C-alpha cells in the first residue's frame, strides 16, 4: 500500500493484537473479586475491559460488582490481581494465529520491531519469553515505563526516540481505539485488527489507515511477500 511505503519500523500492541490474554486476565480478576466475596465476572465480560492497564481493569471490575470506588479498595484489589495474575499470565495466554511466523518475516527483512503495551511492565517479559517471541523486539515499553499510557502518544514518542525514527516511518498495529488514537496523535500510520479487544466496537470506527482481519495480512499490506507466497 502506498501509504506504508515510508515504513522503516513496526510496533505492536500486545493484548488482543499479538496475544489472546483474556483467559489469564479473567481468571486473575475473578479470583481477586472472589477473595473479597464478590461474584466472578467471567472471560466474556472481562475481555471488554481490557486495554487501559491493570488499574482501569480493576476499577471496571469493581464498578461492575457494585462496589463504591475508593483508593484503598482499588489498591487492595489491584494487589490481589497482581498476586493471582503472576500465576495465570503464562498459562492463560496464547499467540493469535501466525503471529510468530509474521514477526519472523519482519525481522528477516531487517525491520526493527517495537512493543508498546499498557500491561504492567513486570508481566511483559516473562510472557513474551514463554511464548517464544521475546527476541523479535528491539524495544519493549510496558505500562510502568511511562507516566501516561495509550491513548496518549507518549509511549510512541518514547519508542520513536529509541529507534531513531520519524513518526511517518513507524507503523503501529493494534486492536483497540486506544492504539489507533495514540498512533494518530503521534503522527504514525496505523493498522487496526478486527479480532481483538475493543470494548465491543468495530475497530473501523476509529478510522485506522487500514483494517485487517488476520495478523499475517500485515506482510502484503506493507509490501512484503505473504506467508503463503513464501511457502511456494
From Swiss-Prot:
EC number: 3.1.3.18
Residue sites binding Mg(2+) per the record: 13, 15, 175
Any GO molecular function: metal ion binding
Cofactor names: Mg(2+); chloride
InterPro entries per record: HAD-like_hydrolase_sf, HAD-like_sf, HAD-SF_hydro_IA, HAD_2, HAD_sf, PGP-like_dom2, PGPase_prok
GO cellular component, one term: cytosol
Biological-process GO terms, alphabetical: carbohydrate metabolic process; DNA repair; glycolate biosynthetic process
EC top class, as a word: hydrolase
CDD domains: HAD_PGPase
Record pathway: Organic acid metabolism; glycolate biosynthesis; glycolate from 2-phosphoglycolate: step 1/1
UniProt superkingdom: Bacteria
Catalytic reaction(s) noted: 2-phosphoglycolate + H2O = glycolate + phosphate
UniProt keyword list: Carbohydrate metabolism, Chloride, Hydrolase, Magnesium, Metal-binding
Active site: 13 (nucleophile)
Purpose: Specifically catalyzes the dephosphorylation of 2-phosphoglycolate. Is involved in the dissimilation of the intracellular 2-phosphoglycolate formed during the DNA repair of 3'-phosphoglycolate ends, a major class of DNA lesions induced by oxidative stress.
Subunit field text: Monomer.
Stored PANTHER family: PHOSPHOGLYCOLATE PHOSPHATASE (PTHR43434:SF1)
Family of this protein: Belongs to the HAD-like hydrolase superfamily. CbbY/CbbZ/Gph/YieH family.
Listed name of the protein: Phosphoglycolate phosphatase
Organism field: Yersinia pseudotuberculosis serotype I (strain IP32953)
